[in-house]
């Protein structure tokens, strides 16, 4: 399951049955807060069991299978990533990063065949660690689904504005 931005058509503020822009915005702000507060186990719980998390390495990349990606995780790899972030021995996070995310321009796109909705938003992420500050910006595409009465992430695609630029290690989830 992948999300191709060229196939996502915005539907502005219309609702897709169970979901409207306000509810999507609340969910995305909640996700950003969990990440900024390093509550990674709670963040992981937002994903479905068959979820994918994808950060393409090329602008407009249509598939994670055709070329290398900055990140392409299934649920199992996400669990490993979260375990590493929780470890006191993760050298790349000594001291731990402090982050601040801004999520904006939230819009609903066409509902998927599974009844889930694709939500598009813009983001800015600032990561501070030691004396360094890094800035990331781009577009999120979330395919959301309802599981056991709660909104869950079935797919998250992160299109970085500078995805094809050289980068130091990417440890913190976007």
What kind of region is each of these model predictions?
Residues 31-33, 89-96, 130-131:
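Short helix-to-loop capping/linker segments positioned immediately adjacent to catalytic or ligand/cofactor-binding
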């Amino acid at each position: 399951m992948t999300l191709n931005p060229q196939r996502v058509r915005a539907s502005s503020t219309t609702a897709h049955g169970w979901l409207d822009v306000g509810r999507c915005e609340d969910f995305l702000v909640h996700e950003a807060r969990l990440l900024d507060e390093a509550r990674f186990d709670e963040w992981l719980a937002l994903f479905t069991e068959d979820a994918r998390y994808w950060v393409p390495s090329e602008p407009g990349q249509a598939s994670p299978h055709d070329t290398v990606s900055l990140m392409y995780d299934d649920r199992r790899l996400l669990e490993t990533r979260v375990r590493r972030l929780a470890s006191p021995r993760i050298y790349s996070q000594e001291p731990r990063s402090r982050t601040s995310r801004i999520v904006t321009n939230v819009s609903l796109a066409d509902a998927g065949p599974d009844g889930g909705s694709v939500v598009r938003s813009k983001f800015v992420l600032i990561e501070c660690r030691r004396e360094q500050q890094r800035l990331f910006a781009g577009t999120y595409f979330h395919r959301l689904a309802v599981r056991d009465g709660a909104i869950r992430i079935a797919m998250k695609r992160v299109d970085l504005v500078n995805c094809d630029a050289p980068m130091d290690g990417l440890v913190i989830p976007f």
